[in-house]
Amino acid sequence: YGEITHTLNAIREGITHVPDATLCLNADCSLTSSLADDVPNKVVWFGVDVPIYKETAFELSDAVYCIHCKTEYEYDYRTYSHLGGFRCPKCGYHRQTPQVGVTQVVRTGADSSDIVLNAFGHNHDVHINLPGGYNIYNAAACVAAAEIVGIDEDTAVDALSRFECGFGRAEQFELGKSKARMMLVKNP
């Protein structure tokens, strides 16, 4: 599978074969945002407009330097690692304004999160029936993708509070006298 830039370049190559496809891209990721460069595809951007947590790990960044000019990025805020309000002080490459953006993280918990989501100019109070900051991103991505395929935004937003994980994804179980949660993740 290889490193992240190999995967990014494979996706970039694939996009060249589908110029009529609408891309659903994370505005907070300087790497995936670059997929919109120099292609005719329409893009629906999603992102998180505010920090998710009070403290986060920035030293784990997958993208410290600008993908275009190799200058270190500056940030208005970060959500996690290299995700957030990035901008390059040298060439001007920057975060796009998302059409679907989390404007407030009301609560993050062990089982769920509550957010305010602005989707195409409409604010929604959203309960995400899954834990984790990455699921806040997933929720925004789902509403953006739903728009692309013609599902109305109210239906998409409502589904977020009713969604339940499949086997092994945030599954809770008892292990002896203790409670445990299984979090399966994948890396490139």
Task: List the model feature ranges, each with a label.
Residues G14-P19, A36-P40:
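Short, conserved loop/helix-junction motifs that constitute active-site signature segments
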Residues A27-L31:
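Short, polar loop motifs at secondary-structure junctions
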Residues Y93, R107-A110, A145-R181, V185:
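Gly/charged, well-structured mid-domain segments that form the phosphate/adenylate-handling core
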